[in-house]
């Protein structure tokens, strides 16, 4: 489990803390919104395209696809462990 978290989050190491946390928050809100771009955008007070762009950046930094359930599950685990331990 620790290895999965480390590998999933490794790609964010070069980002400033504020930017990294913004991406993590976007993912969390998107998940809490049942993967609805529109609902996540309302919570985040931004345009749905902004949510899409941020999620694509998460895919780029992690090498995971948010259209693959296994990848989404790994990212959920990684972000939750990060939130609780960091």
Where are the predicted features?
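Cytosolic nucleotide-utilizing catalytic cores of signal-transduction proteins
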Residues: 1-86
């Amino acid at each position: 489990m620790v290895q999965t978290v480390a590998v999933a989050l490794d790609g964010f190491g070069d980002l400033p803390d504020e930017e990294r946390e913004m991406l993590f928050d976007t993912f969390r809100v998107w998940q809490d919104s049942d993967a609805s771009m529109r609902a996540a955008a309302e919570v985040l007070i931004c345009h749905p395209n902004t949510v899409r762009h941020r999620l694509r950046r998460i895919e780029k930094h992690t090498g995971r696809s948010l259209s693959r359930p296994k990848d989404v599950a790994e990212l959920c685990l990684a972000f939750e462990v990060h939130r609780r331990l960091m």
